[in-house]
């Protein structure tokens, strides 16, 4: 692969060193486990968490005479992902044998795709920001290719004092290796890229994106150079399994390489591991090139071929993807780019929001979902899938505000009750006496009492009318937040002679 530089050096992303500024160059190879019921070349289950060696067929164990048979659903999922990445779909691709020895690779080779992958060049648009002015920066990251391959098994070295065990449950599970171009120039860009890629495959339903389960992991290629110079020698950081760790690994590795180069040394092309405990990378082995694996077409598998009708049928059924959904939220619902970005970041959040916003004011629904619901979930350490407040319940709270049954302040208290205890919002308001006071006589009495008790404050307000809000706050406090704020404000202005 010929590396092409598509970016102009950005001063904001340069790293200062003893000999001047340095630029990081980052490319990523993301392994995404295909969402399918069975493996790439066998009928064995892909269920996560089963007992060791439960999900193993004779094909996965590489028993003599066992031949691979392609799983059509895995092919469909790869094509769907390619379409979601705006990539070229190759209607003819070839499976190759990648030869190397490892105890958890029973065949002695991995079935992958080398020269002729199923998906060619595509792109992802990432957004950084907002900055202090509220602006976002959109950056296009090129996709070099996507190919299908088998996952390996898992070696376990902590089960016995003198022996290592091998679990082949993962052996033969379908992976999509999504290879980016070296277009990223900072750890923030790399994290944004991984976040966006995970969001896309989750929207498509082609990978669950659960990095903690190993179903999505990244090999991060890092090099440094003087701004605009030739590409440096890259090091590959293997199997990084969290977005936060990706950022930490890049920051450490870039500074390690800069220190070596500024000391007059050179960078060795190697594979490294990231140690999250120490926050540093360490050498694993020298980096192999393609010829070290002796790739050749797998003689047990015919070339994979399909027609344009196959691709078009999949394209027709693609769901709305994050960028399109964000554009619709901004154009049709009047949301800010920031709010729309938050809501589309995860498919589950977007689905929840759309259920709440159906038939209601989109901006009000967005405020409640982002500020109240997501804030409460974050504080509780929960994800949107674990929310105790259903879209119907949150929509019910919004409806009660619109009907002026409760005030905005009472709505916050009501949300907290629903979040912690559950229940129907309307029933809770009725049973706990939380209805808004709309009786102007009762509100007027409270206003009169507070004005009479605070003559000094009255004088201040008459001198500076903008201070009238103090009286509104006191009345709301006196009524336990149940008074209608608009009615209170009107009465305060009338009593103090502040009407326009």
From Swiss-Prot:
Keyword Lyase: no
S-S bonds: none
Homology family: Belongs to the GatB/GatE family. GatB subfamily.
Record-annotated membrane-spanning stretches: none
Domain of life, per lineage: Bacteria
SUPFAM superfamilies noted in UniProt: GatB/YqeY motif (SSF89095), Glutamine synthetase/guanido kinase (SSF55931)
Described function: Allows the formation of correctly charged Asn-tRNA(Asn) or Gln-tRNA(Gln) through the transamidation of misacylated Asp-tRNA(Asn) or Glu-tRNA(Gln) in organisms which lack either or both of asparaginyl-tRNA or glutaminyl-tRNA synthetases. The reaction takes place in the presence of glutamine and ATP through an activated phospho-Asp-tRNA(Asn) or phospho-Glu-tRNA(Gln).
Protein name: Aspartyl/glutamyl-tRNA(Asn/Gln) amidotransferase subunit B
């Amino acid at each position: 692969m010929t590396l092409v530089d598509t970016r102009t050096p950005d001063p904001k992303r340069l790293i200062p060193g003893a000999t001047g500024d340095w630029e990081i160059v980052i490319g990523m190879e993301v392994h995404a486990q295909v969402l399918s019921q069975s493996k790439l070349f066998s009928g064995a289950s892909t269920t996560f968490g089963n007992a060791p060696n439960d999900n193993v067929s004779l094909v996965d164990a590489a028993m003599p005479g066992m031949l691979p048979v392609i799983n059509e659903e895995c092919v469909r999922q790869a094509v769907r992902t390619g379409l979601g990445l705006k990539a070229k779909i190759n209607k003819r691709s070839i499976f190759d044998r990648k030869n190397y020895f490892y105890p958890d690779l029973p065949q002695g080779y991995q079935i992958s795709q080398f020269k002729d992958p199923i998906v060619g060049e595509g792109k992802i648009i990432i957004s950084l920001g907002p900055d202090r002015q509220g602006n976002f920066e959109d950056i296009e990251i090129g996709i070099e290719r996507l190919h299908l391959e088998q996952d390996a098994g898992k070696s376990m070295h902590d089960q016995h004092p003198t022996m290592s065990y091998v679990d082949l449950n993962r052996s033969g599970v379908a992976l999509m290796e999504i290879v980016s171009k070296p277009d990223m120039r900072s750890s923030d860009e790399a994290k944004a890229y991984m976040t966006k890629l995970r969001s896309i495959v989750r929207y498509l339903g082609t990978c669950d994106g659960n990095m903690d389960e190993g179903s999505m992991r990244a090999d991060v290629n890092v090099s440094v150079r003087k701004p605009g110079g030739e590409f440096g020698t890259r090091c590959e950081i293997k199997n990084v399994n969290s977005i936060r760790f990706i950022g930490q690994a890049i920051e450490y590795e870039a500074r390690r390489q800069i220190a070596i180069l500024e000391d007059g040394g050179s960078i060795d092309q190697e594979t490294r591991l990231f140690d999250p405990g120490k926050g540093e990378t360490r050498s694993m082995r020298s980096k192999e090139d393609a010829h070290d694996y002796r790739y050749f077409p797998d003689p047990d598998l015919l070339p994979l071929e399909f027609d344009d009708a196959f691709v078009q049928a999949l394209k027709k059924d693609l769901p709305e993807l994050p960028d399109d959904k964000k554009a619709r939220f901004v154009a049709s619902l009047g949301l800010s780019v920031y709010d729309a970005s938050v809501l589309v970041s995860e498919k589950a959040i977007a689905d929840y929001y759309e259920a709440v916003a159906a038939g209601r004011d989109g901006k009000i629904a967005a405020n409640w979902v982002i500020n109240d619901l997501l804030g409460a979930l974050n504080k509780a350490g929960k994800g949107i899938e674990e929310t105790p407040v259903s879209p119907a319940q949150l929509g019910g709270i919004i409806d009660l505000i619109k009907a002026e049954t409760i005030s905005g302040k009472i709505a916050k208290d009501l949300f907290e009750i629903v979040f912690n205890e559950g229940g129907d919002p309307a029933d809770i308001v009725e049973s706990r006496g939380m209805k808004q006071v709309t009786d102007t006589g009762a509100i007027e009495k409270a206003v009169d009492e507070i004005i009479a008790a605070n003559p000094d404050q009255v004088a201040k307000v008459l001198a500076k009318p903008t201070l009238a809000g103090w009286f509104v706050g006191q009345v709301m406090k006196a009524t336990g937040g149940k008074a209608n704020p608009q009615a209170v404000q009107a009465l305060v202005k009338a009593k103090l002679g502040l009407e326009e």
